[in-house]
Curated annotation (Swiss-Prot):
This is 5'-nucleotidase domain-containing protein 3. The keyword Acyltransferase does not apply. The lineage of its organism: Eukaryota, Metazoa, Chordata, Craniata, Vertebrata. Belongs to the 5'(3')-deoxyribonucleotidase family. GO terms for molecular function: hydrolase activity; metal ion binding. NCBIfam families: HAD-IG-Ncltidse. Binds 1 Mg(2+) ion per subunit.
Length: 534
């Protein structure tokens, strides 16, 4: 019997051609179930070679699968690319049901340039030297924006920075001590308080500073306590905020640090013109928010918001009933009046969500709140208060743009095909076959490393490990109904739009096309279609 792949490939083409004839549509890129079924069913149609030439038989199957993928599947996938400005849904949600829109400030209404992370890193590094007596030689380390990614975990006692998947397993090749990888470190992550996760965007300079100081101590054979280092770096990063260093620097050079202001203004104006209620709850101080919003929207920015709350101390704001609101007068003066109403055009400090709900009546699923921090901004609102939530993930756009490249598509489709070959051909246990399979395993690992490094050379994508979602994505899926790169993605949709989550097959389900393709519709807007929904 000869290779089963030509027969299988002809069956695939015939099946897809018949489907195209019936639906009058080309096969969408993400409807790949039939193709993966073809690849992964390869050996099932074969009884093995008649001649006993196992190497030739396996090589023939390998070449034919690779040819079919490169000539037929890759062009199909490349014809329908995702738009990085789309909104993606974890839960079904209709904007028609939303009456009230709430926002965080930092990295939600205000987006910052990379200069801000350099400022945080340099300032915290100097605080370590000047106030914690760390060696002045660490001043030679500069901030590297390409080192860390959001969502990493740090083992406080072992000084290890690592990437963990949704099943709490450490991804191989992503454990770093200092600035160097720790080889062959893999397995179930440790439990308890030893691991700390870095979830917000402001944590990127903190992770980099931790790694740089660890690197200095390791290179110079200096004995140190990792727990003390972690606490000192954490305190230095906190002081950059608490002591007002960051706020003063941004206010003094706002054009350098804040970007994309016109996009935020367009979203707020659209919602206001359609009669939606809006509020702002942020941990940032009043003067900082005021100067930023003056730059982004204009001096009348408060007219857009029904309620403005600063220095809210989230996530405590969502849980602590004891703290009352306090009105902020001009120049930041705090008034002692008891608050009976939250007035439009005024600014309030602290408070708590329970009093907020009582004074506004904005409860349940008619409220949609946007923030960038999955825990501090979104978790309690989803779990305890029933608000709908939207996560702002600035990294999303660049990751989708990478996934849309021909290099990534070719790499990942072949990785899937090679995995299918390995899965089916592992039944051949003779020495010659095992040599071929070991070569395939090595190539598969190379493909996985290549795909990972397209996003970040050290840690890969913030959304997935080699074959599982990351721990970060697991929490994002749990606490955010929708997620997007920025608020400006809302401009691509009218306010009657319903977001539907994409049906994905479970491990025990057939990889058939989801109902969205069977009905000829796309639930995730493609790049060439976005103009039609504006």
């Amino acid at each position: 019997m000869t290779s089963a792949v030509p027969l299988l490939s002809r069956w695939c083409r015939a099946t897809l051609a018949a489907r195209k004839k019936l639906t009058h549509k080309a096969e969408p890129a993400f409807c790949k179930g039939i193709w993966w079924q073809c690849v992964r069913s390869l050996a099932a149609l074969s009884n093995g070679p008649e001649t006993g030439d196992m190497r030739g038989y396996l090589t023939s199957n390998y070449k034919e699968v690779k040819r079919s993928i490169n000539e037929e599947l890759v062009p199909s996938v490349s014809s329908s690319l995702l738009n990085p400005d789309a909104i993606f849904a974890n839960n079904e949600m209709s904007l028609e049901d939303i009456e009230v829109y709430g926002f965080d400030y930092d990295y939600t209404l205000a987006f910052y340039s990379k200069d801000l992370h350099t400022l945080i890193f340099n300032t915290a590094r100097d605080l370590l030297i000047n106030e914690h007596r760390y060696p002045k030689e660490i001043r030679s380390y500069e901030y590297d924006p390409n080192f860390a990614i959001r969502g990493l975990h740090y083992d406080v006692h072992k000084a290890l920075l690592m990437k963990i998947d949704s099943f709490h397993y450490i991804q191989l090749g992503t454990v770093y001590r200092g600035l160097n990888v720790v080889p062959d470190f893999y397995g179930k992550s440790s439990e308890g308080n030893t691991l700390k996760q870095f979830m917000d965007i402001f944590s990127l300079p903190e992770m980099t500073l931790l790694s740089c100081v660890n690197e200095y101590f390791l290179k110079n054979n200096i004995d140190y306590e990792p727990v003390h280092l972690y606490k000192d770096v954490k305190e230095a990063i906190r002081d950059v905020h608490v002591k007002g260093i960051l706020y003063r620097a941004v206010e003094a050079d706002i054009e350098r640090y804040i970007c994309y202001g016109e996009r935020t203004q367009a979203v707020l104006s659209k919602l206001a013109n359609l009669g939606k209620k809006m509020f702002l709850i942020t941990n940032s101080p009043s003067s900082f928010v005021n100067k930023g919003m003056n730059f982004i929207v204009g001096k009348d920015w408060r007219d857009l918001f029904d309620v403005v709350i600063v220095q809210a101390d989230k996530p405590n704001f969502f849980n602590d009933k004891r703290r009352p609101f306090r009105k902020v007068a001009e120049r930041g003066i705090l008034l002692w009046d008891k608050i009976h109403h939250l007035e439009k055009g005024q600014t309030y400090k602290q408070g708590n969500l329970f009093e907020f709900l009582k004074l506004t009546g904005w409860r349940g699923s008619k409220v949609l709140y946007f923030g960038d921090h999955i825990y501090s901004d979104l978790a309690d609102l989803t779990l305890k208060h029933g608000w709908r939530t939207g996560a702002i993930i600035p990294e999303l756009k660049s990751e989708i743009e990478i996934m849309n490249t021909s290099h990534y598509i070719t790499t990942v489709t072949w990785l899937q095909g090679l995995t299918g070959l390995l899965e089916r051909m592992q039944v051949y246990r003779d020495a010659e076959s095992q040599m071929v399979l070991q070569d395939w395993i090595k190539e598969r690992q190379e493909m996985r490393d290549l795909a990972r490094k397209m996003f970040n050379r050290q840690f890969g994508s913030i959304f997935r490990t080699d074959h599982n979602p990351t721990y970060f994505l697991r929490r994002l899926s749990r606490f955010a109904d929708i997620y997007m790169e920025s608020l400006s993605c809302l401009l691509n949709y009218d306010l009657h739009h319903t977001f539907y989550p994409k049906r994905t097959p479970l491990q025990h389900e057939l990889p058939v096309c989801s109902e969205q393709q069977n009905t000829g519709t796309f639930r995730i807007p493609l790049g060439k279609e976005m103009a039609q929904i504006k």
